[in-house]
UniProtKB/Swiss-Prot annotation:
Annotated membrane topology: Single-pass type I membrane protein
Top-rank taxon: Eukaryota
Signal sequence bounds: 1-22
Organism, as annotated: Caenorhabditis elegans
SUPFAM superfamilies (alphabetical): Fibronectin type III, Immunoglobulin
Protein name: Ig-like and fibronectin type-III domain-containing protein 1
Classification via SMART domains: FN3, IG, IGc2, WR1
Keywords: Cell membrane, Disulfide bond, Glycoprotein, Immunoglobulin domain, Membrane, Repeat, Signal, Transmembrane, Transmembrane helix
Major place of residence: membrane
Record lineage: Eukaryota, Metazoa, Ecdysozoa, Nematoda, Chromadorea
Residue ranges, Cytoplasmic side: 940-1029
Length: 1029
């Protein structure tokens, strides 16, 4: 089983398939040797039950594998032998370093086997939790920094090597945990300042907050910068003046929007000390050109000569009040989203609605300002940059009151102006035999001094020589040296050997040299190296489909006849007798990736040279979505992907046949091609329509794709109880009801057993929002995706298995909503009800919806009103009870409802026009009622009362049956709430056992009084209760 070099005999195959089948979990990893041979096995028709051997798996083979072991074992061994020569092994020495709360740095070394064949690496990372998705990052380079991780979370990662012919198995999995981050309390207004790695910016006396922020959390372990609460700043100014004994006539000047009058000149220092709040405002004072003797008002000791500096008061006020004006906060999350050799796209997070422009500044590495640009969107693209150069950028938000503090700098380096992997050394050239004694052969080559991008190598080059006995071995032998020659020893006499060499600088390995064949025979020289020339000579090696090319393979002028075979894709040409060259003229097509020229003689010796060709793919452009549904004031992203057809395509978007004017373009080059995204912020009705992604290549060819943006303004449900009420009405019960509930944990994919409710779930999940992205991530098949986007759908398609996933995505879209309202206040008067409520201060777009209907009437429709104010007036019937629900909403969804009630008037109001006689009788009735109430109050003092009177006044005069008043604490929480337990209402005053007391109040039912106490039935309506909402 372990001797892969030879195919097993028929008898051995039977034994392996039966007796030895249980040993495969031990053998498979060994013979796979860190490489994945599955692709080859599939091409050779190996059955599914035996593919575990090809992938080096440790899984046991099932009973059904007996057949494929008998039929496919030889094919499996052939693929494994082939993979030894063409597949790299897994990356080695994978290590984790430089952990933060949101990032990790990964390093690795080249594979132990076939490192020269590696073209790129792929990183796989996921949270170490059940059901978490795997993030795939292609073309990573060691060391690699992976960003966007969650703090205080455990992750697992592996790496995979890729060559042109296959891949390795994943490397040994690495487990690590990101660092925790302390989330500070929420600021009164806005959010604290965060660093680029997600940590909060710490402030103290040495590191003060920028203008517009104050250092809070004093006395705790964490002090951070929060935006100034402008509603309290002047109050603090005034209180400071009072404490400093400011004269009453000057107190009106202790406001940030006031200056100090001349009559208060002698109190200038008191005004300065309170207005400055002890902060250093020197930078602002210098900008305002405050005279040097008067600058001590802007910094310690905050005292100035009043006569000399009183004229500077207006400048002081400008600086002191700047921190309390509604200036923009610092721009957050500045990122360099795409980088090329001469351009870079900068994006950031726009959190405020009143920004009029962003100032974007570009700096050189030394800090010199190069460019200053203005952007009305939260993205900007710098062009005409220098290749392979370090830059930094920062962004400042500006509104009508002024500019906020600058963001943190984001640094980046433009790409070199060379071809892919230009930092690798070039392949060694002119590999040849220096001398040959038979068992020992000296081979030499020209030294490598430059990289593929023409830069000079700066570190020592290590050469690796590979040689293989073509007849008796399948394993390459390697030798390493820092010289440009090496002696291969102990060769088998008269044997043929393949030999090639690679160069390595640090961890970057070149492509292989040409391959020569050596005959281990005394004084047997090698063959000359062929030279391949391709016309036209594209420096980047990229050719267009259908382009006419000429490939020439030639030898130096020698007198010996040699055979020359030139192979390009499916084309093979040979030289004429005695000719030292061969030419192939053809058109470039997709089958061409390498030009191979082999020179051979009659002794079996060869010298093989190769040259790689890169072919452009046929131009195509596709839209990510054919239809995009958006809501009023929502942002939309129209994405198209362009593949092939030109090195520098021009990509633009059109709307209804004209160039799109509202929005901005974000372009990014990826391994798959170009990804273009057209962003439109705060969509309006006029933005709806058909959008085209138009791509024009350098040769003038044009391709395009279309997508429709569908606009909708209705975001509120007809029924305020939303999805949950629909599910309850449809009879969905048990755990399946959790999928309908906003804020609850949805069912995991493994536990879905709700197919009996599938039709009902899909009905209630119907929504105008587009949930396609969520559904795709949840594994919903393409045939069922129309249910996620509100499109037309064929009832003949069965989507019951995806019902819970579709419902979960529908619910998630509603969770991205404003927070709920609080402190609802109701004031009723003469048939009108005024309702007010509180809502957190925010600059985000929102409005409120108020639902109301008569209580205790489930058949009456809800009435719905919308407002942008935090109050509303309703016309209601004063003789009816009403239930009211209020929610906050925006384009992303709406909050949970806050319920309340409007009680009816205790007595209908009478008209005031009935005259004085009506007033007289009202007074008489009130006097009679007063006398009656007073009499009942006197009677109630007596311990024993006749039954009718006692029942009438509701007395419970049994001292052993105490009473209690309670209200339902879950009122207004229709989806849940705490239970309430009422203890101590039952039993007598005598001492009972603990068990008896426990069982007495734990009963879940309302329990009537003892049947033996009929004479006092009115006194003891219930003994105790446990209520569950």
């Amino acid at each position: 089983m372990c001797n892969v070099a030879e195919d097993p005999s028929s008898f051995s195959t039977i034994t392996i398939a039966t007796t030895c089948r249980a040993e495969w979990p031990k053998v498979s990893p060994c013979i796979a040797d860190g490489r994945n041979h599955t692709d080859c096995c599939l091409k050779k028709g190996v059955q599914h039950d035996c593919l575990e051997i090809c992938s080096g798996s440790t899984k046991e083979l099932g009973v059904h594998s007996v057949l494929c072991l008998n039929l496919d074992l030889q094919a499996i061994y052939q693929c494994i032998r082939q993979g030894y020569e063409t597949h790299p092994s897994a990356p080695g020495n994978v290590t984790i370093s430089e952990l933060t709360a949101h990032s990790v740095t990964v390093q690795w070394t080249e594979p132990n086997s076939n490192a020269h064949l590696v073209e790129n690496y792929t990183l796989f990372i996921r949270k170490n939790e059940h059901g978490e998705a795997v993030r795939t990052v292609k073309n990573v380079i060691s060391p690699h920094v992976e960003l966007g991780l969650d703090p205080d979370s455990e992750y697992v990662l592996t790496l995979q090597s890729h060559s042109a012919n296959g891949t390795s198995l994943p490397s040994t999995a690495k487990l690590f945990s990101t660092l925790p981050t302390t989330r500070p309390p929420l600021c009164t207004i806005g959010e604290p300042i965060y660093m680029n790695d997600g940590r909060v910016m710490i402030c103290d006396a040495v590191n003060p907050c920028p203008n517009g922020f104050r250092c809070t959390g004093a006395g705790s372990d964490l002090s951070y910068c929060c935006p100034h609460d402008g509603t309290h700043s002047s109050e603090e100014f005034t209180s400071c003046c009072k404490e400093q004994k400011m004269p009453e006539s000057c107190m009106s000047s202790c406001q940030y929007n006031m200056t100090l009058p001349e009559s208060c000149k002698e109190n200038l220092n008191t005004w300065v000390q309170c207005a400055s709040e002890g902060h250093d405002h020197l930078r602002c004072c210098l900008q305002e050109e405050v005279s040097k003797p008067c600058q001590t008002a802007c910094m310690h000791p905050f005292t100035v000569p009043a006569d000399e500096c009183f004229s500077e008061v207006s400048k002081y006020r400008t600086c002191f009040s700047a921190a309390h004006q509604a200036l923009p906060a610092a721009v957050r999350n500045v990122e360099v989203s795409s980088i090329s050799k001469d351009s870079a796209t900068i994006s950031w997070e726009d959190l405020e609605a009143n920004i009029i422009v962003f100032r974007v500044q570009l700096f050189e590495k030394g800090g010199n300002l190069i460019k200053t640009e203005n952007s009305s969107a939260d993205i900007f693209r710098f062009i005409d940059l220098e290749p392979n150069k370090d830059y930094s950028v920062r962004v400042t938000a500006i509104n009508f009151l002024g500019e906020g503090p600058p963001s943190w700098n984001a640094t980046f380096t433009t790409k070199p102006a060379q071809i892919y992997e230009g930092d690798r050394p070039v392949a060694p050239e002119k590999l040849r035999i220096s001398w040959n004694s038979g068992p020992r052969v000296n081979v030499t080559w020209d030294p490598v001094s430059v990289r593929r991008n023409a830069e000079v190598v700066t570190k020592p080059i290590e050469y690796t020589i590979y040689y293989l006995d073509t007849e008796q071995s399948s394993t390459w032998t390697t030798l390493r040296t820092n010289q440009t020659w090496v002696v291969m020893r102990d060769l088998r006499k008269d044997a043929l050997y393949y030999v090639y060499v690679t160069a390595k600088e640090d961890n970057r390995t070149s492509r292989s040299s040409s391959i020569i064949t050596i005959l281990a025979q005394k004084d047997s020289p090698g063959l000359p190296e062929p030279t391949i020339v391709i016309e036209p000579d594209h420096k980047d090696g990229v050719f267009s489909p259908g382009e006419k090319i000429s490939i020439n393979c030639s030898l130096p002028n020698i007198k010996k006849h040699l055979n020359i075979d030139l192979t390009v894709g499916s084309h093979v040409v040979q030289n004429d007798h005695g000719a030292l060259w061969v030419i192939l003229e053809t058109e470039a097509d997709e089958a061409m990736d390498t030009a191979t020229c082999a020179v051979s003689d009659t002794d079996g010796r060869q010298h093989v040279a190769m040259k790689h060709l890169v072919l452009e793919r046929k131009a195509s452009v596709t839209m990510k979505k054919d239809k995009i549904r958006v809501l009023d004031d929502q942002s939309v992203e129209i994405e198209c992907i362009y593949r092939g057809g030109g090195l520098d395509p021009k990509i633009s978007f059109e709307k209804d046949g004209k160039k799109a004017s509202r929005g901005f373009l974000n372009l990014k080059k990826t391994e798959a091609g170009y990804v273009a995204k057209w962003h439109i912020r705060k969509v309006k009705q006029e933005d709806a329509g058909f959008y085209k992604c138009v791509v024009t290549s350098s040769d003038g060819s044009r391709v395009e794709a279309s997508s429709e943006v569908i606009f909708s303004t209705e975001t509120l449900p007809v029924n305020p109880k939303l999805i949950l009420q629909c599910c309850e009405d449809e009879g969905i019960t048990g755990d399946c009801l959790q999928a309908c509930n906003i804020g609850r944990t949805s069912l995991s994919i493994k536990n879905q057993n709700c197919t009996r409710f599938a039709v009902s779930l899909l009905k209630c999940a119907s929504d105008i929002r587009d949930h396609s992205d969520c559904c795709i991530a949840s594994g919903v098949t393409s045939k069922c995706l129309p249910l996620c986007s509100g499109d037309s759908f064929s009832p003949d398609i069965d989507c019951s298995e995806h019902a819970v996933s579709i419902m979960t995505c529908s619910v998630k879209s509603h969770e991205h909503a404003p927070s709920e309202v609080s402190n609802v206040r109701i004031k009723a008067s003469e048939g009108k009800v005024n309702i007010e409520w509180d809502y957190p201060l925010t600059k985000d777009y929102k409005y409120f919806a108020v639902y109301y209907r008569k209580a205790h009437d489930d058949h009456e429709d809800w009435h719905k009103l919308k407002t942008i104010q935090q109050n509303i007036e309703l016309d209601v019937d004063p003789s009816e009870d009403y239930e009211v629900g209020i929610l906050a909403a925006n384009a992303l969804g709406h909050s949970r409802l806050m319920y309340s009630a409007i009680p009816k008037d205790s007595e209908p109001r009478r008209s005031a026009s009935k005259g004085s006689s009506s007033a007289f009788w009202i007074v008489v009735i009130l006097v009679v009622f007063g006398v009656l109430i007073a009499g009942l109050a006197v009677l109630s003092k007596r311990r024993e009362l006749p039954y009718p009177i006692g029942k009438f006044i509701g007395r419970r005069n049994d001292p052993n049956q105490p009473t209690v008043a309670f209200e339902n604490p879950a009122y207004g929480e229709p989806w849940g709430g705490a239970e309430v337990e009422i203890r101590g209402l039952g039993g007598s005053a005598t001492t009972g056992t603990a068990a008896a007391t426990q069982s007495e109040w734990q009963s879940a039912n309302l329990e009537a009084n003892s049947t033996t106490d009929n004479s006092h039935e009115y006194r003891n309506g219930m003994r105790y209760a446990k209520l569950e909402t």
